[in-house]
């Protein structure tokens, strides 16, 4: 497979893609399975309180109540069309890189960590502008993503923006590969597989994220696959963010509900819908909630609109 450096604004999901081959996917699952021999993984300590803000599409923010560690999953904010899909006006703080950085600075976080699932424009489109804007405000900004993508695919772009990759990308610029871990200022990230494709050929990933006593599964863009059950057995996530938009690119509401059931999450939030004519509109959320009621009625489903913040308290779970 040929790997190429990429421009964050160049690729969109409706352009031709380089597919992550089945062979490589199976190898990735083998890595995940091998990680089960490493012993138990326990969630980070904390109160179980989490603020969640959905920015539209597949992009969302996690933070404890004091905003000490802010985690962004993917980086498509001021160019995000998710508000339009709901007929909503985008708030001023999400309208530009500078405005967003100002709003984050006002919250006085110890750090902001940007976790990248893959390089399609509706996830990666604002990445370098975001990192640069936060850095220019003297905010401690870090990032984590698939190791080869971070070290090879976008390495030159960091230099173009005047950024030091080794100081921004966790694990001294290496990122993480499947089954790998990165930890920083109270947040922990573990890479898990996603069945999707990328513009550059580097494999897409999802994340297990531990923050303030809550374990989050972020599916990224993916189809349903059998080893989601292994993710559940291995990591027992409390909260799952799953793509539900269907259409040409990802699983839809029914398969997303099955995914939540397989990973064993006690709470679920649907994302990646209503941001493009190619995916389902706002109705996808209700379709997902109905499917969850059939498949796993005890799972608490939170439906959100772009820009909204939900405050969740998730009781501690006993894990191996």
Positions of PLM-derived features:
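Active-site-proximal loop/helix segments of hydrolase catalytic cores
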Residues: 195-263
């Amino acid at each position: 497979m040929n790997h190429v450096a990429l421009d964050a604004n160049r690729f969109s999901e409706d352009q031709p893609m380089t597919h992550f081959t089945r062979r490589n996917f199976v190898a990735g699952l083998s890595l995940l399975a091998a990680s089960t021999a490493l012993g138990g993984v326990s969630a980070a300590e904390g109160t179980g309180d989490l603020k969640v803000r959905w920015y539209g599409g597949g992009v969302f923010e996690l933070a404890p109540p004091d905003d000490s560690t802010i985690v962004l999953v993917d980086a498509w904010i001021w160019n995000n069309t998710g508000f339009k899909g709901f007929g909503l006006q985008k708030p001023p703080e999400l309208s530009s890189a500078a405005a967003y950085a100002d709003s984050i600075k006002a919250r006085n976080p110890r750090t902001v960590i940007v976790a990248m699932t893959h390089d399609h424009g509706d996830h990666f489109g604002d990445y370098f502008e975001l990192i640069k804007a936060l850095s220019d405000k003297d905010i401690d900004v870090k990032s984590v993503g698939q190791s080869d993508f971070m070290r090879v695919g976008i390495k030159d772009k960091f230099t173009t923006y005047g950024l030091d990759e080794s100081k921004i990308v966790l694990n001294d610029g290496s990122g993480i590969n499947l089954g790998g871990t990165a930890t920083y200022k109270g947040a922990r990230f573990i890479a898990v597989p996603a069945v999707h494709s990328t513009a550059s050929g580097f494999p897409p990933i999802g994340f297990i994220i531990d923050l303030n006593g809550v374990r989050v599964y972020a599916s990224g863009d993916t189809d349903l696959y059998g080893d989601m059950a292994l993710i559940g057995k291995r990591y027992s996530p409390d909260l799952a963010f799953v793509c539900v938009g269907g259409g040409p690119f990802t699983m839809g509401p029914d398969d997303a509900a099955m995914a939540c059931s397989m990973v064993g999450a006690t709470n679920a939030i649907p994302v990646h819908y209503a941001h493009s004519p190619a995916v389902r509109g706002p109705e996808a959320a209700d379709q997902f909630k109905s499917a969850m009621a059939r498949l796993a009625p005890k799972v608490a489903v939170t439906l959100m609109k772009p820009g909204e913040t939900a405050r969740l308290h998730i009781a501690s779970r006993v894990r191996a």
